Every structure is written in C-alpha cells, then in structure tokens.
Amino acid sequence: SSMTETIKLMQSHSSVRRFKEQEIPQEDLNEILKAAQMASTWKNFQSYSVILVRSQEKKDALYELVPQEAIRQSAAFLLFVGDLNRAEKGARLHTDTFQPQGVEGLLITSVDAALAGQNTLLAAESLGYGGVIIGLVRYKSAELAELFKLPDYTYPVFGIALGVPNQKHDVKPRLPLDQLVFEEEYQELSVEAIEAYDRVQAEYAGARATTTWSQRLAEQFGNPEPSSTRENLEQKKLL
C-alpha cells in the first residue's frame, strides 16, 4: 500500500485538549521545533517567531485571558507570532523606508506561522504527544502583547497547547473530498450539500452538539469582526 507512516499519522489527527501531568523532555521539544523550522517559508524570510511557555504561572495568566482548559493543562504552550520585527532590522541595512503595513504582510506572516505550526503538531504527534491549535488568542492581542513583551511589527496568530494526551477522540469527519478539491476549475456547493454536511457533523458530535456546522458559520461571519484584532495590528504598525 502507498500509505506511509507519515500519511497514516496525518490522516489520524484529532485535537487533544486534555493532558496528563507530564512534561515534554527538552530533547523532544528541540526535535519538534527543528521540524517546525523546516516548514516552507516565503523567500526564507521566516516571518514568524515562537514563544515557548512552560511556567505554570504564565500558562495560568494566559488562561485568565483565553479560558481554554488545554492552555492550563498543557506541558508546553507555543505562541506563534507573525513577525516582521527581524525584517525591519534587516531591511534597514539597505533602506530608510520600512512599509510593511497592509494585507500582504499579514498574509506572509500568518501563512509562514501556520506552516510552521502544522509541522510542530505533526512532529509532536509522531512522538506520541497530542495538541490543539488555539486561534482565540487573536481576540486578546493587546493583552498577549503585554504578557509576552511583543514588540512593534509582531502579533499573535495562534497558539498550540501540547502534552501527553489524556483523551482520545475519533477523527472528525471532513467535507467529502470532491466538495473541497475540484478538477481544473472551481465548483460552488449547493445548499443541499451544506445541509448534508450539517447532518454528518451532528451525528459525529452526538449529545455534545449544541449548534450545527452552518450555525457556527453564521456566528463567525454574520457580524463584523471584533475591532480588537485590527486595533492591535494598527498599534504594532502592521496595518
């Protein structure tokens, strides 16, 4: 079969939000982070940084801002930061103008961070650890900037809580592949397809389900985004 160990690992991913009280050895963290660093990056700029949080005090302070149990329980919490602070230092060797403000800079930094983040999670899972990516940190950008001393030209993109798993979930059903991968040109989905996927998701979630998949889309995108994200980006000179 063409199923490698790598593919098996990738296809069996599920988020882990509960962890045992066990540390991740430094050696394992080093290997995980070296794997993260080899992710593809735009022009090799490496426009992200990682803040490794292991002190319980820091994790608790973060939990106060972003009350996700995975943060408190994690052996290590990794904050992925979109980062053009190094870029500014490099660019200023050659130019007096540094103008990273705008959408392109945000895309470059967040894509770089995301690719490194996915490598991080896969490397950790390959060593038997589990984790969850937490995007909610963006809603507390200003507070996190203070907590982690984030300078100009940086912003939190997401965090990853890592640890020894204390729970096991079934793999969450994704959309049928042909509704996500289109041969040669885009095909818009029918309302029926969305409703069918609502049913698949409801079946998977069972008693835990409080809203449908499409209801969650309405909650996320039915209103203007919170102003805090934009305000922090402006404050950090990225917008």
Residue map of PLM features:
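Acidic, surface-exposed loops and disordered segments
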Residues: 1-239
